[in-house]
Amino acid sequence: IYEKHFRNAREAGSYIIMDNSLHELGEAYDTDRLMYWIHELEPDEFIVPDVWQDYVQTLVNAKKWKDVELPEGTTKVAVVQAHDYASAFECYHILKNHHGYQKIAFSYGADWYAKEFPHPNPLVGKMMGRIMTISKMYKAGLIKDSDRVHLLGCALPQEFSYYPDFPFIESI
């Protein structure tokens, strides 16, 4: 079903972002399987394999994938993974300035977001925690107006109303 959907979307000229299935499977697909589908579907963007809330292993994967050849026109997107704000800041900095990723994503459900913004409703905590994380990185000058940021899903859709003054958020 998914394959047919993506082939139809490609034929219709739709913009395709291919994920690595970390959220659905708990870990990214293996490299050979990912490469097969990347070459079959030729997505516009590909989310390189990351490791949930583990910035060290995510950076190791991102370093490996930065040199992997993908079809022409496919942009590699790296994901910030972390266990707190400091490691998220470092992860974004390294992905952008050392690994050279042109587009970087933020997941929506990291547990530590709720620690940034404690709230009785954990979904509100995660929503506001991601907003605060991105806002603080922008205010600190790490994220620039010209950066390209993708938001991977959301804890609550109300989150998107907080971003109209963030020119770097390119896609959701």
Which role does the model predict for each range below?
Residues I1-P71:
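Non-catalytic, usually N-terminal nucleic-acid engagement modules in DNA/RNA processing proteins
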Residues T31, T58, T74-T75, T133, ...:
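Residue-identity detector for threonine
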Residues F6-E11, A62-G73, K96, I131-D145:
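Surface-exposed amphipathic alpha-helices with a cationic face
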Residues D32-F46, Y92-S107, Y163-I172:
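Structural recognition of alpha->loop->beta junctions
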Residues I1, S14-D19, D44-V48, K76-V80, ...:
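Hydrophobic faces of well-ordered beta-strands that scaffold small-molecule active sites
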Residues M18-D30, V77-F89, D111:
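Active-site mouth loops of central-metabolism enzymes
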Residues W52, Q81-L152, L156-Q158:
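Glycine/Thr-rich beta-alpha phosphate-binding loop at enzyme active sites
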Residues V56-E72, V77-I94:
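HhH-family (HhH-GPD) DNA N-glycosylase catalytic core used in base-excision repair
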